[in-house]
């Protein structure tokens, strides 16, 4: 066993830990606004809006400038590269504006999924090349955390051992590079909801993947107190004939996390995985009411589940800005309560119950 060669000073560790704790402070979660230009195209298509840089700026400005009620609900915002360099109508860069609200600025740094040869349609994630230099630049440009998504899918033959090992190593490598630059890495090993597998199978696979990932993070000397985990909730496959209760989903999820995620990790920020807005809030709420001990904050890092109703209300029309912001604030408040186990389902919004599932989801 070789000696450790510490690559982080106590001050660097403190900075990372402070950032992570700020993002998942009580009642706070993450607004994932890091959809790629291609993903925004799909969202805008659904509201008959042209996918131009200006329309993307206007839409994200609506989210970032929602009134003070949203303030205490959001701990961090994940940006897409383009958005990082856009400005508000008042001429402030988006990162400056977001920071002025006390929200931490984050950036998606992966370059998307690519096929993994010799597997049954499995993938790995690219983007490690040049990441060291990009992190240095992003830190200068105001980013304090980052996100990297890996994708695994459940079939009778997958995820394979190769796919698990490869993706976990990529996540660990990314995490250690971020930490060298004072950036908190969010590690996202998403297990897709596609398939007809039951809840037990998802739980089993989630446990195996998370165990492998934390082993890889340890092998790469990643400082866990300065990381966050962005996992899928443990749900059955979308085509599974059996429908499980929110309580069953919460118990399966918290059990899987308790078996694999070290208590040193400050927070777990769930992805919504195509659940409806309401479902994503209810499941998060029930997890925070779960009778099992939870040593980490359980909160949200939602994209569609914070934005779907807002996007619909906006419809690409300048006059609908206020209505869109109201819908966004409604979801932000709901999830802020849910991550404290205090949410009472309302079910009043038309779009909130719509399923947001997209098969084989790629950002």
Curated annotation (Swiss-Prot):
It comes from the Eukaryota. The active site is at residues 188, 230. Gene3D superfamilies: Aldolase class I (3.20.20.70). The keyword Lyase applies. Beta-D-fructose 1,6-bisphosphate binds at residues 43, 272-274, 301, 304. GO terms for biological process: glycolytic process. PROSITE patterns: ALDOLASE_CLASS_I (PS00158). One of its GO terms (molecular function) is fructose-bisphosphate aldolase activity. The record marks 363 as: Necessary for preference for fructose 1,6-bisphosphate over fructose 1-phosphate. Keywords: Allergen, Glycolysis, Lyase, Schiff base. It catalyses: beta-D-fructose 1,6-bisphosphate = D-glyceraldehyde 3-phosphate + dihydroxyacetone phosphate. InterPro entries: Aldolase_I_AS, Aldolase_TIM, FBA_I. Its EC number is 4.1.2.13. Signal peptide: none annotated. Disulfide bonds: none annotated. Pathway: Carbohydrate degradation; glycolysis; D-glyceraldehyde 3-phosphate and glycerone phosphate from D-glucose: step 4/4. Plays a key role in glycolysis and gluconeogenesis. In vertebrates, three forms of this ubiquitous glycolytic enzyme are found, aldolase A in muscle, aldolase B in liver and aldolase C in brain. Belongs to the class I fructose-bisphosphate aldolase family. Tetramer. This is Fructose-bisphosphate aldolase A.
């Amino acid at each position: 066993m070789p000696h450790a060669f510490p690559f982080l000073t106590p001050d660097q560790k403190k900075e990372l830990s402070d950032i992570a704790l700020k993002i998942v402070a009580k009642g706070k979660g993450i607004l994932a606004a890091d959809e790629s230009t291609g993903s925004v195209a799909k969202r805008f298509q659904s509201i008959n809006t042209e996918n131009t840089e200006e329309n993307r700026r206007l839409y994200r400005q609506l989210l970032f400038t929602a009134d003070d009620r949203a303030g205490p609900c959001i701990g961090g915002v994940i940006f897409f590269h383009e958005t990082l360099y856009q400005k508000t109508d008042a001429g402030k860069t988006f990162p400056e504006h977001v920071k002025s609200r006390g929200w931490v600025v984050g950036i998606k740094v992966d370059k998307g999924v690519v096929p993994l040869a010799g597997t049954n349609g499995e993938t790995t994630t690219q983007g490690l090349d040049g990441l060291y230099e990009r992190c240095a630049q992003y830190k200068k440009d105001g980013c304090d955390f980052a996100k990297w998504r890996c994708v695994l899918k459940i079939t009778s033959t997958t995820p394979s051992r190769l796919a698990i090992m490869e993706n976990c190593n990529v996540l660990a490598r990314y995490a250690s590079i971020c930490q060298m630059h004072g950036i908190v890495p969010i590690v996202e090993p998403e297990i897709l909801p596609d398939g007809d597998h039951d809840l037990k199978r998802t739980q089993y696979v989630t446990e195996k993947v998370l165990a492998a990932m934390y082993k890889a993070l340890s092998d790469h000397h990643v400082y866990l107190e300065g990381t966050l985990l962005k996992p899928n909730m443990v749900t059955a496959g979308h085509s599974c004939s059996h429908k499980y209760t929110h309580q069953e989903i919460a118990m399966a999820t918290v059990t899987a996390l308790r078996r694999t995620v070290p208590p040193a990790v400050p927070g777990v920020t769930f992805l919504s995985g195509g659940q409806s807005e309401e479902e994503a809030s209810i499941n998060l709420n029930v997890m925070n009411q779960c009778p099992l001990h939870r040593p980490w904050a359980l909160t949200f890092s939602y994209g569609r589940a914070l934005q779907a109703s807002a996007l619909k209300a906006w419809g690409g029309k300048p006059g609908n800005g206020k209505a869109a912001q109201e819908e966004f604030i409604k979801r932000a408040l709901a999830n802020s309560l849910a991550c404290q186990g205090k949410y009472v389902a309302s079910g009043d919004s038309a779009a909130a119950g719509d399923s947001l599932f997209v098969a084989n989801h790629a950002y």
